[in-house]
Amino acid sequence: MARLDESGLADLAAACESEDVLARWRAKVVTVEGSSCAWWTGAVSGRGHGRFWLSSGRVVVAHRFAFAVVHGVEAAAAVPVLGHRCDNPLCQRVGPGHIVASSYVQNRREWAIRRAHAGSPLGDPRGARQRARELRDMAREDPALVAVDLARLRALCGEQLALW
């Protein structure tokens, strides 16, 4: 995410306090049986992350908005990188095992290690963007389809072992 200037941080703070904006964000998040992630069903970036419009002309990475809602705008602004410990760029769940504060170096190191594990979603042959779009579309249509696709990937590639 490009660093937000003062105006952007003010927009983010206002969005975090707006029931209308929060309701709009929540409407784009679904649960999938068998997954502890909160799945984004809105717009997706080229890297497979959710994109969320705070207001006209102001878009943020959806999980950064979620982090700001949970931890506050100052905390979100202070964190250079948010890591997905669940390896799901669509995930909106903030907390251990999912979206956590990280650094660029730590995030890239963890990505490289986990990508090499059999069954890792990071090694999905569709690539991050296509995988995210397909899973997002499934989650929109019927969240149960996501569970089927995740099971298919595990059967195809094997189970991913926990890194920690």
Predicted regions and their residues:
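Short, cationic Gly/His-enriched loop motifs
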Residues: 58-164
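Short helix-coil boundary/hinge micro-motifs
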Residues: 1-56, 74, 86-94, 134-137, ...
